A protein has these predicted regions:
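Conserved N-terminal segment of class I S-adenosyl-L-methionine
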Residues: 2-196, 205-211, 274-275, 342-358
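Short, glycine-/aromatic-enriched active-site segment of Class I SAM-dependent methyltransferases
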Residues: 10-17, 224-252, 256-263, 277
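A SAM-dependent methyltransferase catalytic signature shared across enzymes that methylate proteins
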Residues: 34-42, 256-274, 328
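Conserved catalytic loop of SAM-dependent methyltransferase domains
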Residues: 50-53, 270-309
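Short glycine/proline- and charge-enriched loop/turn segments
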Residues: 98-99, 237-246, 286-292
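Phosphate-binding active sites in nucleotide-utilizing proteins
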Residues: 201
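Short glycine-dipeptide loop
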Residues: 216-222
């Protein structure tokens, strides 16, 4: 599909939303940590939207008491919707096309990774009913059936993609909305609940965890994968670390904080893995963000005038010129992964927790 008509159609609405400035998309700034309540906060980093380059500046604060990282001030619901729109205009995917960009950056979850997730839970249980939260197009449930053929998979997602997933047969049942809002309706229905890189984008991860506990039967398992803000890549790359993902990530939770909250809610952690969930894309992702920040911006709906053909041509040429460097960075990501994940560079963790009785 040609992108230009979509950009033209979106321009008036986008400019109207920005007429009062991007500050309107932020809630009041917090003076305490949303995780532990401590007032001991420090600014960890400030960033612009490095992927889409929409207007605005975003701050990640870190709590000195519990090390929780959170966007402060946080985006409002309207702001989150604004910055998550226009997925076809995401940096390298727009400049090189989605298939090549995903291959060079190594960010798309592979079939092997999905199967490994299912196998990780199968060690503890072969669930009868599994709910995948934030399922999107439901690729995980569709693939997990290969190793869990007797499990019924349902999906939950706020977007229309969940309806397509039901029609295509990737999930048995689809729930559109958020888990905190739907949890009472789903109470006690599932033996397993999964959240893969879902909590970081949630306004309130604690409510998501409460919803997961409510949806699970006693003895059921919760599987979580999340970006690890304590990894060495996060400190080395700073703003350019793809795991920061501003403004889309609202929370980055240290593993200890998540484990403590799971225990408080009545879970027993049965497995933790900081190696297998690693996505080998840090160097390539950081390079792509740097390239994107220096190229002329393409034809986007948040600029008042359409981009001239020359500017669009220069942008495409710049992306194609960067392909050899991106390919080299991707190769290094993959080659170094076995070593780096043993030395604190793993960029994600996986937690499997069992809901206690009662």
């Amino acid at each position: 599909m040609d992108v230009a008509p979509t950009v033209a159609d979106r321009r008036s609405a986008c400019l109207a939303a920005l007429a009062q400035g991007p500050a309107r998309f932020h809630e009041p700034r917090r003076t305490d940590c949303p995780w532990c309540g401590s007032p001991r906060l420090r600014v960890l980093l400030r960033s612009t939207d490095l992927v889409q380059r929409k207007p605005g500046t975003f701050t990640l604060d870190q709590c000195a008491a519990c090390s929780h990282l959170f966007q402060n001030p946080r985006l409002t619901p309207e702001g989150r919707d604004f910055y998550r729109r226009d997925p076809h205009l995401y940096g390298a995917r727009e400049g090189l096309g989605a298939p090549l960009a995903d291959r060079l950056l190594g960010t798309r979850t592979t079939d092997r990774r999905h199967l490994a997730r299912a196998l990780a839970l199968r060690v503890f249980d072969e669930p009868e009913c599994w709910l995948d939260v934030g399922t999107g197009t439901a690729r995980f449930p569709a693939l997990a059936r290969r190793v869990l053929p007797y499990t019924s998979f349902d999906g939950l997602d706020p977007g229309r993609r969940i309806e397509d997933a039901v029609r295509s047969g990737r999930v048995e049942e689809g729930h559109r909305g958020s888990l905190p809002a739907l949890a009472h309706r789903l109470a006690g229905r599932y033996d397993a609940v999964s959240m893969f890189h879902h909590l970081a984008g949630s306004p309130d991860p604690r409510e998501e965890l409460k919803g997961a506990r409510l949806a699970l039967r006693p003895g059921g398992h919760l599987m979580i994968e999340a970006a690890d803000p304590e990894c060495r890549y996060a400190r080395l790359l700073g703003t350019w670390w793809p795991g920061c993902a501003q403004p889309r990530h609202l929370h980055l939770m240290p593993l200890a904080g998540l484990r403590a909250e799971l225990k408080r809610l009545g879970f027993t952690v049965v497995a933790v893995d900081r190696r297998a969930p690693h996505v080998p894309a840090d160097l390539a992702g950081a390079l792509a963000l740097a390239v994107n920040s220096r190229l002329p911006q393409g034809d986007v709906p948040w600029r008042a005038r359409p981009a001239p053909l020359l500017r669009r041509g220069l942008r495409r040429a710049g992306w194609w010129a960067s392909v050899p460097l991106l390919a080299l960075a991707h190769a290094l990501d993959r080659l170094l992964a076995p070593l780096l994940t043993r030395t604190g560079f793993g960029n994600a963790y996986r937690v499997i927790a069992r809901r206690d009785p009662g």
